[in-house]
Amino acid sequence: MAARRDIFLQLVDVASECYPDVEARQIAEMIILAKGRISRNDLLIEPNVELEIPEFETICDELRSWRPVQYIVGKADFADMELTVREGVLIPRPETEELVDWVAREAKEGARILDVCTGSGCIAIALRRMVPSSEVWAMDISPEALAIARENGAEYAPDVRFVEGDALVDFSAQFKGVMFDAIVSNPPYIPESDRALMRPNVTEYEPDIALFVEDSDPLIFYRAIAQTGRKMLNDDGHLYFEIYESLVEEMVAMLEHEGYTEVTVKEDFRGKPRMICARVSSIAR
């Protein structure tokens, strides 16, 4: 037992061994709120109330070994939701919320939307909640990721339809002729050579299958989805991707080569080009 504030400060000290101060404080807060089952107001208003976290030492060891805080607490914030996450599924990122906002702003009421490489289901579930009367499907190759996505769907958007499928092959037959107004994807896109630039909390814990692609063809997922997307998008349907900032020119050229038009690139909140949208052309079908 120790005062809430003392536990919080101990967690900050431990997290600071791996992370910058601001991030360490955010991590410490996430842990004490989740594991202590208290609110932020509880921590601020009554910092001296005693609290017990039985697994405290284990949590500290996990932090020192770079285990992501989202896996430690089993949750990740996304949009207005607190999604379940575990090893085996990519942790949702704030940049992806911006992609969701873009799709939601442009989607019409009742739109049919497909999320490819859904992971935790964050994109599909958020879009179902944000686009009135929408019909949303979500696909992933990983049974483990789909199990987590279905858990999240059951809690936040029970009518999202989850399908197991491989984005690298023509997956149109699995949807039995259903046509979509929008296809959105945050596929693997980080070149393997950039692995060394990333922190251990990503490279040692999050699934490689959701992150990395071979240097020889970093657009492999984008191209495959764009090619299948031509068959599955309604006239004037749109394809949306989260992208790697170093691949923008290649992405624009690839989409235009595949027959898409009105290719638009957007920057994220950090000013980096991280999202792209293109309209399908009936001529390209």
Where do the model's predicted regions map?
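Conserved SAM/SAH cofactor-binding pocket of Class I
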Residues: 95-197, 224
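Conserved Class I SAM-dependent methyltransferase catalytic core
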Residues: 215-279
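Residue-level signal for inorganic ion chemistry
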Residues: 31, 66, 96, 123, ...
